[in-house]
Amino acid sequence: MAQNIGLNVQPPKQECKDVNCPFHGTLPVRGQVITGKVVSDKMMGTVVVARDYLHYVRKYNRYEKRISKLHAHNPPCIQAKVGDLVKIAECRPLSKSTTYVVVEVQQP
C-alpha cells in the first residue's frame, strides 16, 4: 500500500522494498518539484533529468536557452526510462550529487 507523500501525484501500481522510495520507504520529500526529461538511466537506481530554461543576456537584450541536469533517485516501483517526462521532488541528500527523487512518470 502506497502512502500519501503530500504531493498531487498518482502513486505507482507496483510495490517495492526500497528504503529510499517516498511511497513505500521512509524518504520524506519537501521543497522544489521540477518537471524534466530523462536523458540517461545508466546509473544503478539513478537517472539524469534535464530541464530547459531561459537566461537573459543583458548586452544583447535577448534570452538564450540553457540546460540544467539534475541527478534523481529512480525507485524500482517507478522505473523511468530515457525519453520519459518525469516529475522529481527535492529530498535529503542521498549521495554527493543526488538530492531529488522521481515521484511520477507523466503521460505524453
Curated annotation (Swiss-Prot):
GO CC terms: cytosolic small ribosomal subunit
Keywords for this protein: Ribonucleoprotein, Ribosomal protein, RNA-binding, rRNA-binding
GO terms assigned for molecular function: rRNA binding; structural constituent of ribosome
InterPro entries: NA-bd_OB-fold, Ribosomal_uS17, Ribosomal_uS17_arc/euk, Ribosomal_uS17_archaeal, Ribosomal_uS17_CS
Gene Ontology biological process: translation
Alphabetical list of Gene3D superfamilies matching this protein: 2.40.50.1000
Annotated transmembrane regions: none
Organism domain of life: Archaea
Subunit structure: Part of the 30S ribosomal subunit.
Family: Belongs to the universal ribosomal protein uS17 family.
Reported function: One of the primary rRNA binding proteins, it binds specifically to the 5'-end of 16S ribosomal RNA.
PANTHER family: 40S RIBOSOMAL PROTEIN S11 FAMILY MEMBER, 40S RIBOSOMAL PROTEIN S11-RELATED
UniProt name for this protein: Small ribosomal subunit protein uS17
Encoding gene per record: rps17
